[in-house]
Structure formats: C-alpha cells, structure tokens
Amino acid sequence: MNLLYRDYPQGALTSLHCHEGPQFCYLHRGGGVISSEGTGVLLVAGQLCLIPAGLAHEFRVLRHSQLSLVYLDDLDGGGELTIRQVSPLLVGLFDRLADMAEPGLRDAYLTVLAAELRQTPAATGFMLSAGLDVRLLRVLEQVCRHPSIEYGLAELAAGSGASVRTLNRLFSQQLGCSFRQWRQQVVMGRARQLQQQGQPLSRIALELGYGDFSAFSHAFNRCLREPAGP
C-alpha cells in the first residue's frame, strides 16, 4: 500500500497516464473531472473515486484541489471508473493521515484505511457519458470556484455561450442530473470542508449564500446523514 498527497492549482490538467495497480483518489477540497476515453467522473470535496489498473486517465482541476492517492496492488479495481461511498471513518482517516508523522501510529492508521477501502461499496456519482462540453465546463468552473446556493442557471448561461435550455440538456445528458442537484452537492461539499476547519455553521451558511439559516441547517444535516454522492 502506498499513500501520496497531491496539490493542484485551479486550471491544471494532468497528462494522460495510467497505473500498474488500482488507485483510490479522495478529494479533500476543490473540484475536478477525472476522465478516460469516452467516460469520466466529476469529483467534489469529500468524494472518493476508484481508478482501475491500466486505465488511461487525466485530471482537469476546476478549483484548487488537494487529494489523497492510495495504491492497493492486491485489490481488484474492475474495469471502469467508479465513485465509492465515503463513511465518517474514512473521512477521519484521510484527514488524520494528512498531518501524521509518527511512523508507528501512521502504519496502524494505514492498516485500518486499507481495510476500509477494500470493503467500501460503489456509490452513485456524477458520471460523464461523453467528452465534457466546453459550455458546460464554464458553468462547472464558475460554481466550483465560488460555491454558492445563489447561483441560477440563467445567470451562468450568460457567460457560458449556451442558453438555459441547452445547459439543462447538457446537465441531463452529460452528468445525469439537474443543475440544482449538482449545485447542492458542490455547496454541501464546501460546507463540510469549512466545518472541518472549525468555522461556525452560521458563518458557513452566509458564505454559501443562504439567507435562511434553518434552510441551510436542514440541507446540511441531511447531507451529513447520507454517504458522499448526489
């Protein structure tokens, strides 16, 4: 087992590459698209992706991102990109290991992490059915840069080069969800990140565009009860 950390600036694009063994990618913060020929997954903060061995892929960074990359050679990663469920234990392990230096304790945590990853089930996620349309990409980049519940598709369409109707179609065809479903996932991912940084929920609600704290509280509590995914 090998655990690495990567930090990618907004707008970065890795070259097409593959790995000898399966790779788990956990996104601590940020947002981006992992794509291979004909398919891809859209990752937001708090999500986990499994990349099979030998699958050529690239990572397009929509927002400054920090990732944990785990390589498990003795795992059957299947043949396709998949989103995996993220339990509270996995979140805690990834976050704790990010600053852990003591070798003995770190090895113990890695053993638990490997065991959890081997049994984590598949989850629903934002799967890209084809190459990402550049007009949709502009919308994804804007919302990932500054997550807010206040974004409306009419506002975003003005800078995307597409009509609201076209963007609705692209969300449905390429992500399999509505704009509102995707926006909510991005906003709640950012909320989880800010909470882990110790910020009070009232401040988080304001930063994410909620004028009604009770509406934010309801959405956030529902998010915490569900595995990371749409």
Question: Which functions belong to the PLM regions below?
Answer:
Residues 183-192, 230:
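Short, basic, alpha-helical segments at the C-terminal edge of helix-turn-helix-like DNA-binding modules
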Residues 1-83:
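N-terminal regulatory/effector-sensing and dimerization cores
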Residues 195-230:
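Sequence-specific DNA-binding recognition helix
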Residues 77-144:
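Amphipathic alpha-helical segments enriched in hydrophobic/aromatic residues interleaved with Lys/Arg
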